[in-house]
């Protein structure tokens, strides 16, 4: 089939990485996939022109509100994938919730990353019960074997021996919902007591106003660094070399960065929110914190307890291998897309 795939494609964001991986799954099944950024279109009529020009037969959208609403009212069948924003933010706005309800009426299937997301969606839109499937994110990491960690540290203005460093890494697009400043003050205090601990924030500048605020705060914060986005292979190499991966988001659908860190055998410290607690079991596959002070306590414990670190890393790797199989994700999407083929034949 000739498929249209709409997603938010800001480079080096979780959405773009997920969309690229899912496109690969669909193309591996023999489909031709036209991947487009939902933000490039303002109305369904622009999509209608694209469908006609490209002779598209079916469609998929990552995010119901940002992408799915643009697929309504055309003659082609489509499926949708819930993003964290759909359920954590947009569902709280009456008009957006109504729009997403109409999208679900027309969609042939919908995918949620977790059982909790599915449950939330079914409460919000009871009429969609029966067409929502759960498929967690499939994870495959490919760290750049030639990446130079010492050069990265120098570029980050961290002038200490790599042997005795503890780098806590936050990977996120710079926007308020990711809350990268949540831990900055507490961490900076800790760094002044313990100069070999650093926090490095890596990610694209998504929100220009918020980015200025982040840069200003980080510039004044001892032991905290801000690094521009980088390609996936280099980012995986950074994760593999750091001491721990940190997630301080206000809300998440399912953080690929957390799962990638687990796959790379790096301990995870995550803010205790539903999206994170769905994949991190406290003390088993990672550590969950509810405030900056608790984060510092847990980080200090992790630094001083190699046995805990080893246990968390072992369990995290096993969890990802068992529950976030790239192959299972591929099989699921290739099977679901056949629902759109069936509709073409009807």
UniProtKB/Swiss-Prot annotation:
Its EC number is 2.4.-.-. CDD domains: GT4_PimA-like. It is found in: Secreted. InterPro entries: Glyco_trans_1, Glycosyltransferase_G1. Keywords: Glycosyltransferase, Secreted, Signal, Transferase. Its main location: secreted. GO terms for molecular function: glycosyltransferase activity. SUPFAM superfamilies: UDP-Glycosyltransferase/glycogen phosphorylase. GO terms for cellular component: cytosol; extracellular region. Residues 1-16 form the signal peptide. Belongs to the glycosyltransferase group 1 family. Glycosyltransferase 4 subfamily. This is Glycosyltransferase 1 domain-containing protein 1. It comes from Mus musculus. The lineage of its organism: Eukaryota, Metazoa, Chordata, Craniata, Vertebrata.
């Amino acid at each position: 089939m000739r498929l249209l795939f709409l997603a938010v494609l800001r480079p080096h964001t979780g959405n773009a990485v997920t969309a690229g991986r899912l496109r690969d799954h669909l193309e591996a099944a023999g489909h031709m996939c036209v991947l487009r950024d939902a933000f490039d279109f303002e109305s369904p009529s622009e999509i209608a022109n694209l469908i006609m020009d490209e002779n598209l037969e079916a469609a998929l959208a990552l995010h119901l509100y940002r992408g799915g609403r643009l697929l309504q009212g055309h003659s082609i069948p489509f499926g949708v994938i819930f993003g964290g924003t759909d359920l954590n933010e947009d569902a709280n706005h009456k008009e957006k919730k109504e729009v997403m309800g109409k999208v679900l009426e027309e969609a042939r299937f919908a995918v949620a990353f977790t059982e909790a997301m599915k449950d939330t969606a079914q409460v919000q839109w009871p009429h969609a019960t029966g067409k929502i499937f759960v498929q967690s994110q499939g994870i495959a990491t490919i760290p750049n074997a030639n990446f130079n960690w010492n050069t990265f540290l120098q570029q980050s203005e961290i002038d200490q021996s790599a042997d005795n460093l503890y780098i806590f890494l936050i990977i996120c697009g710079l926007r308020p919902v990711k809350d990268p400043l949540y831990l900055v003050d507490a961490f900076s205090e800790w760094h002044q007591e313990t100069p070999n601990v650093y926090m490095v924030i890596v990610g694209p500048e998504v929100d220009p106003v918020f980015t200025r605020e982040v840069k200003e705060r980080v510039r004044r914060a001892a032991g905290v660094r801000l690094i521009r986005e980088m390609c996936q292979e280099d980012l995986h190499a950074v994760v593999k070399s750091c001491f721990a991966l940190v997630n301080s988001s206000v809300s998440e659908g399912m953080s690929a960065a957390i799962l990638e860190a687990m796959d790379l055998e790096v301990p995870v410290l995550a803010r205790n929110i539903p999206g994170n607690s769905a994949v991190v079991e406290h003390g088993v596959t990672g550590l969950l914190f509810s405030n900056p002070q608790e984060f510092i306590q847990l980080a200090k414990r992790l630094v001083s307890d190699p046995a805990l670190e080893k246990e968390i890393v072992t369990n995290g790797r096993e969890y990802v291998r068992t529950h976030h199989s790239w192959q299972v994700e591929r099989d699921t999407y290739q099977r679901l897309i056949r629902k759109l083929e069936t509709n073409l034949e009807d």
